[in-house]
């Protein structure tokens, strides 16, 4: 876009030199040259910023995977950034949708429900998840508005469907600081365990996606295990065991 604008300015400068008379003949090209210089500086800074951001992402990816991030495809950088540092929940949802589709799951908007973001089906089975996607500045907690939708889906879901939460937590923190952070409040974890609802952080989902792409895990088998087991919490710290029961959350 910057190049096209500079080309337009150059064309107008030539046009001004040919068309205008006296002072205007010099003034118009001069203004165009000044504008071209300014646009060039802006483009340079934009390129430097994009390069610095990519270097930061490479560094953060190396911390997650402990592998050389230079092998990562160019288009994956946007996916990674919007998964781990999302700007809004809609972009995060689109990214999670793309990841599950890339892994081979059947994913749809679940228009038959008003309380779920996506329906994810495990291929060649009748098993399905009603997925909610959450974005959290800190840890996921009971007060997040999506939690009410999760329990609404619990009332509406079919027998072969299970609730699944994908949460991008601590979105302002670098990867190095997320490993030791709490990603879900104790109260919410207890409720999810009680109602057999699984919780996966975006950080953990990224790791699963990369392992699936490298053929290190059978991703369908992994999610079949999630489906068959009780409510578990999958975070950068690993799989947390079932927690002590908390007070009942009323599903009315």
Each model region followed by its residue ranges:
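Juxtamembrane interface helix immediately N-terminal to a transmembrane segment
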Residues: 1-8
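C-terminal, charge/polar-rich interaction regions
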Residues: 13, 63-67, 247-252
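Juxtamembrane "helix exit" motif at the C-terminal ends of alpha-helical transmembrane segments
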Residues: 10-18
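Hydrophobic alpha-helical transmembrane segments
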Residues: 17-32
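Catalytic core segments in nucleotide and nucleic-acid processing enzymes
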Residues: 79-245
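Transmembrane alpha-helices and immediately adjacent membrane-cytoplasm interface residues
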Residues: 31-44
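Interdomain/boundary linker segments immediately adjacent to catalytic/signaling cores
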Residues: 45-87
């Amino acid at each position: 876009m910057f190049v096209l604008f500079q080309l337009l300015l150059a064309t107008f400068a030539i046009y001004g030199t040919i068309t205008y008379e006296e002072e205007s003949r010099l003034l118009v090209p001069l203004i165009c040259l000044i504008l071209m210089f300014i646009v060039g500086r802006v483009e340079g800074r934009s390129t430097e910023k994009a390069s610095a951001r990519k270097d930061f992402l490479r560094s953060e990816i190396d911390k997650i995977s402990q592998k050389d991030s230079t092998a990562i495809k160019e288009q994956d950088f946007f996916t990674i950034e919007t998964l781990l540092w999302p700007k809004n929940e809609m972009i995060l949802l689109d990214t999670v949708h793309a990841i599950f589709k890339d892994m081979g799951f059947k994913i749809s908007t679940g228009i038959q429900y008003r309380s779920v973001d996506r329906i994810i089906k495990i291929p060649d089975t009748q098993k399905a998840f009603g997925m909610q996607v959450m974005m959290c500045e800190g840890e996921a907690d009971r007060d997040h508005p999506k939690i009410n939708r999760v329990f609404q889906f619990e009332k509406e879901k079919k027998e072969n469907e299970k609730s699944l939460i994908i949460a991008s937590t601590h979105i302002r923190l670098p990867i190095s600081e997320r490993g030791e952070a709490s990603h879900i409040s104790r109260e919410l974890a207890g409720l999810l365990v009680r109602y057999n609802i699984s919780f996966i952080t975006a950080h953990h989902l990224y790791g699963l996606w990369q392992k699936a792409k490298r053929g290190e895990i059978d991703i369908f088998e992994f999610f079949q295990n999630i489906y068959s087991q009780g409510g578990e919490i999958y975070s950068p710290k690993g799989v947390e065991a079932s927690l002590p029961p908390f007070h009942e959350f009323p599903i009315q």
